[in-house]
Amino acid sequence: MAGSDAEWVTIANNLLFKCHIHLRIHELQDCDANVFIALYQSILGEKVPDLIVIPRSQEDDAHNVQAVIDSLALDYLQVSLSHITGENIVKGDKESIKNLLEIFDGLLEYLTERISETSHEKSETEQYFKESDRGERLEEPESTKESKSSWKRVSFGRCSLSSEMLGPSWDGDEAESTGEIIRLGDTAHTFSLRSNGAQCPNEMLSKKALASPSSKSHEDMLYPPSVLSKSRTSFVEDTETLSVSGIPNARKLGEPIRAAIPLHPPYHPSEPRAPCPIGKEYLHSSHCSPAVNSTGEHTEFSGDLDDGLFLISKLPKGSKWEVYPAQVQGPRTRKPPKGKRNENRATASSCNSPFPQRPRKRLTEQELHDVSEKLSQRLSELDWMLKSALGDRIKEKTDHKEENTGNEEVEDGTEETLSQHSDGIVEYGPKKSRPGLSMRRKPPYRSHSLSPSPVNKHKQFHLERKRQRKPRETDVRQFQAQAFTEAFERELRRHKVQENIGPLRIHEKEEETEKIYRGEAVRKGTPECSQPWKIYSRKTTTQSLRGGLPKPNKAVPMKVSEHSLLPLMLEQFPFLYVSGPTLSKMWKQQIAQVEQLKKEACRENRSKKKLQDEIEEALRRHDLLTTLVKKEYEHNKRLQDFKDCIRRQRLTQSKIKENRQQIVRARKYYDDYRVQLCAKMMRMRTREEMIFKKLFEEGLNIQKQRLRDLRNYAKEKRDEQRRRHQDELDSMENYYKDQFSLLAEAISQEHQELKAREKSQAQTLHKVKRELRSKMEKEIQQLQDMITQNDDDVFFRELEAERFRSRLQLASFQYSKSPSL
């Protein structure tokens, strides 16, 4: 038994060591309420329900231990633990302590196994994506490796950081979440570079209006829309608002936008990076490549960007991937016509280039398709909302500023071939400029191509064009900052009015204005724009095979007044929850930003360069504000995803395994308890039998010894009386001869002595009886008190044995009296 106790002491100390609890026990009885409460809180990470923090008595300790046992039985194990009670634990019952220690040991082992399994699955998926991205980068030409090296390090570092920070609670079934981490992480990174991208917004928009689909996708990757709201809060006021991507099965704006996985704060580089590798690398990370099925054929896969729908047809094994840019529709009519898709297929099928393909290892076809649809739908919805919020305001400012700008000739878009996440290639044909549209040409960010011959010429040409556009870009950037300053001033004035008349009336008025404007826009249609860089809603066109004119894509802009951005966002996201303090904080931050920008804009006596630096600083602070809001939103998403993962793990993945373990554990506990109870009953019966046998033997011995003593005592008394009687007779005969009178006195005196002796003997006997009676009554009273206090059967038998022994003693003493008479 001692060895068993030592083993359980070792188990308890190991549990305390694994849980980092600075307690050590030396005996099994040292496992009191504090030990089990500490184990519960350390293993399960929760406070004990109904806990008495400062126990003042043994009953409080028993209550705390019972609360631990009840929580384990009801909340985690779903089995009955009635054989373990808090009172027995506090009293130091070894069996109860062992059972509870065994439960905690098994629970810790089970949780450790689950954590290791999920961590292993996460590390395997993360390692696969790392190897996939690394292999893709090794296949790129030597001409592009040097320009992309810095961005690769950033992308890999950010991807691994996001994967490692997820923890073991990430659900193993959501394998597609890792790919979304890479894409959304790059999106968050490019958001930090928007201050650099704001230098030439108008030229960039003119480039996007007539460039090829590949260059459009490239620009989309350079300036993606970002979510900045916590539940129903604000989103980014971007200086370039992209058009809506047309996808057949896109979600409506009323449905919730669910983040695939919690994001971490974006990586802010300390040195500027070239936009060319940013766009290229983002395209790698924002597309999931199609898998190769078991029959040797490449399945169809649609990868959606902001304003391009790429259709990959089903090809036999060994052939090339063919990717076709499809016609993009407006936010209300999303499905492109069938004839236009056929024309796009015919256009893009003429420029295919072979590229090695690698089959995917883990993600299935359906998972890849779902990931692509989720990302494209999110980007398209956010793009449309950003465009609606800011497009009209910036359009008015740009129209006023760019009225006298001269027209320049437009160059044809260069042919580019992009690899799609290391599994296929995306090829685009040259894009002809639209006749009748002349605009300024922004130097393209991506001058590289997979064909190595014209790379250097294109780079030289674009560098020269960029140097020529530097003064114009500076003017455009200053105008853009001024436009934002004026917009924030109007926002501030509107907020002051809103404080006087109430937010509800303004919200209703904005809804009516929005409905009227949308109705007029639907009736009149989208106005023609001779200079596409003046508006934020781009018109994506597709060159047909026969050289026909591309049709503009119609998008309904949204009017956003000064202080209606946050109410409009609350209207567009009615399904998101925003707490009162968060909403008030957003209003205060926006108003503070508006006031500061207003103060900076009103200082006309400053120099031009100083004013420009202040406006850029205000824009940077605005980006920091939006980053903070985004972090808050992502934090809430991480918490929600963490809770969802735990709930799914408990309800779906681990349910069968936990049920089996619970059945086995309950059966084991029942068998152990039954064996222990049987052994205890056998020991009890054996002990009672031994007590009865011992009592009988002791009674026999006492009876024999008492009889011997009584016989010896009676014999001694008889001998003594006989000797004394003989002496008296002799003395009487002697004295009778001498003195008759003395003899008579001696006889009378002897009679008196005999009477006195008999009287004293009777008194002594009566005194002994009274003492024995009082002693027996006292012992009987004590035995009765002990019987009422302790109902143990063994102790009851011992009391009966003592009472029977006392009765034997009393009976034997009465028996010894009869021979003396």
From Swiss-Prot:
Family matches, as Pfam families: DUF5745
Region entry Disordered, spans:
118-149, 323-369, 395-475
Positions with biased composition (Polar residues): 345-355
Which residues fall in a coiled-coil region? 585-632, 700-794
GO cellular component terms given for this protein: centrosome; cytoplasm; spindle pole
What keywords sit in the KW lines? Coiled coil, Cytoplasm, Cytoskeleton, Phosphoprotein
| Basic and acidic residues composition bias: residue spans | 395-404
Q: Which residues carry this modification: Phosphoserine?
A: S449, S451, S453
- Record's protein name: Centrosomal protein of 95 kDa
Q: Which organism is it from?
A: Homo sapiens
What lineage does UniProt assign to this protein's organism?
Answer: Eukaryota, Metazoa, Chordata, Craniata, Vertebrata
